[in-house]
């Protein structure tokens, strides 16, 4: 079963954790100095916040799958709809290793589709890079036209330097 994913950039982890813990009546499933994640079942959502990325607000949206088959189904659906799909393969971000790919909606909002393979002790295993002003985990590159695995090329605002 798929789980909806929302990742927000926040200015203060402490204030945001206090707010969202009260809102959800639940403590985060994962809490770090720069990141928190709630794995809620009602509604079924992976809600994450971090201080990495750009200005406060929506960093990216997405779908987390329970297995590789569901992830492949999402990718096939996007390709059949002629959407540009940027595949990352296996990537580390947000204290996890995942198989993932990205889409961008017509307004430029990044959509992550991923299957988490396991947790890691650091935000990312990439070489540290300066904070960027766009999606925290979106593929690293200057604002450009993505070369999709399938579908048509779409202008996707990407990080000049990914945070994870």
Protein language model annotation of sequence segments:
Residues 13, 62-110, 118-121:
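Vicinal oxygen chelate
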């Amino acid at each position: 079963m798929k789980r909806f994913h929302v990742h927000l950039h926040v200015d203060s982890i402490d204030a945001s954790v206090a707010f969202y813990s009260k809102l959800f009546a639940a403590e985060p499933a994962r809490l770090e100095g720069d990141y928190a994640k709630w794995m809620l079942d009602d509604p079924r959502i992976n809600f994450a916040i971090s201080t990495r990325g750009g200005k406060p607000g929506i960093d990216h949206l997405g779908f987390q799958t329970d297995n590789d088959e569901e992830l492949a189904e999402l990718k096939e659906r996007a390709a059949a709809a002629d959407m540009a799909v940027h595949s990352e393969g296996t990537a580390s971000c947000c204290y996890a290793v995942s198989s993932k790919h990205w889409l961008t909606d017509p307004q430029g909002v990044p959509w992550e589709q991923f299957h988490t393979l396991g947790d890691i002790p650091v935000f990312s295993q990439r070489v540290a890079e300066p904070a960027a002003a766009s999606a925290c985990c979106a593929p690293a590159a200057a604002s450009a036209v993505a070369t999709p695995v399938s579908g048509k090329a779409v202008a996707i605002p990407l990080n000049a330097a990914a945070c994870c």
